[in-house]
Amino acid sequence: MKDIYDVLVIGAGPAGSIAAKTAAEKGLDVLLIEKRQEIGDPVRCAEGVNKEYLKKHVEIDNSWICADLKGSRIYSPNGTKVEMAEEISGGEVGYVLERKIFDRALAEHAAKAGAEVRVKTRATGLIIEDDFVKGARLMNLGKEYEVRAKIVIGADGVESKVGRWAGIDTSLKPIDIETCAQYLIAGADIDPEYCEFYIGNEIAPGGYVWIFPKGEGKANVGVGILGNRTGKFKPRPVDYLNNFVEKKFPNAKIVEMVFGGVPVSGSIEKTSVNGLMLVGDAARQSDPITGGGILNAMDAGKIAGEAAYEAISSGDVSLEKLEEVYEKRWRETTGHDIDMSLIVKNCFINLKDEDLDSLADSLKEVKFESMRLFDLLQALFKANKKLLWDLRVLFKDAAKEVMKNRT
């Protein structure tokens, strides 16, 4: 490990690895570090991802594909089923990944591009001089290092310390985080071509239950509950999950379990300071509805890698420059989608089960294969006029999208 690099990336998840790869491909000297001894482990993710969006960033390798899905099925509290084709099911439906292999592959891509990759290496603090981030203090195998870099990219996940060290407010209120529990089960009787989502205040208050098939009778089965609806004197996510699994898969065996939190807050006020950018869950760039963050993280990582090159090449790594080449760009793309999802989330978390049943009933006969956003919203909210008003901004956005496609 050297003392000086162009770019130091802290965290080797999808956001960090894509940022490191992109910067290295531009000819920058990049160090990518990961605090764990194995990249991609433990997995804290349902592992679903949209095919076409994924192909924007990587060439598909079957070694990290567990299942190729046709679509998704959503079940309302009374069991009403809404089925959607994969193309319009959202960012988490398409492929089911083996994240342990996938994340390592992304880090390998960064290494092949020229980045230096170090595992079991954690940041213990930032080097800040004259109000500029100049690098970080690292710990590797019990030895301390001081590594300087022209730009630091914080990709250290939902529990990010890098942002706090830099003075960025990344705090989350209970309502802004989904507390999650997930089992990998074997011996499950499950349709291998569809993922399933179950909603309702009895089954997952403020969240949902998911099932992602992984082939050969295996599946990720998990639940996310809003943080303000669990805790002391309230059932825990694992309690909801156990209840669901016992009823749905009485003969299945649990072979792995993971627990964690997912930010569903929407984007934070700023994701950069002098000499530093935040990406992925560290920047709260996950989808506020689903909690899914792989694709948003990869998008932001790519933008950050390109921004690092532009800023360093210009000799200007100030906040003003990073706002121009990173902040502005990701907010106009990924950030816009996050803002729209947050509007939907804030409306839906207050719906009663009978409202959810009514909405599902209005959609159960809809042919989703060819439906556009505007058509979907029209059908969805015939059953709930108040919700239609609360989400009126989405209709305006959908109308703009229709007009843009016509020009």
UniProtKB/Swiss-Prot annotation:
FAD binds at residues 15, 34, 45-46, 48, 99, 123, 281, 293-294. Its cofactor is FAD. Gene3D superfamilies: D-Amino Acid Oxidase, subunit A, domain 2, FAD/NAD(P)-binding domain. The keyword Lipid biosynthesis applies. Pathway: Membrane lipid metabolism; glycerophospholipid metabolism. It catalyses: a 2,3-bis-O-phytanyl-sn-glycerol 1-phospholipid + 8 oxidized 2[4Fe-4S]-[ferredoxin] = a 2,3-bis-O-(geranylgeranyl)-sn-glycerol 1-phospholipid + 8 reduced 2[4Fe-4S]-[ferredoxin] + 16 H(+); 2,3-bis-O-(phytanyl)-sn-glycerol 1-phosphate + 8 oxidized 2[4Fe-4S]-[ferredoxin] = 2,3-bis-O-(geranylgeranyl)-sn-glycerol 1-phosphate + 8 reduced 2[4Fe-4S]-[ferredoxin] + 16 H(+); a 2,3-bis-O-phytanyl-sn-glycerol 1-phospholipid + 8 A = a 2,3-bis-O-(geranylgeranyl)-sn-glycerol 1-phospholipid + 8 AH2; CDP-2,3-bis-O-(geranylgeranyl)-sn-glycerol + 8 AH2 = CDP-2,3-bis-O-(phytanyl)-sn-glycerol + 8 A. One of its GO terms (biological process) is glycerophospholipid biosynthetic process. Disulfide bonds: none annotated. One of its GO terms (cellular component) is membrane. Its EC number is 1.3.7.11. Reduction reaction proceeds via syn addition of hydrogen for double bonds. This is Digeranylgeranylglycerophospholipid reductase. It comes from Methanosarcina acetivorans (strain ATCC 35395 / DSM 2834 / JCM 12185 / C2A).
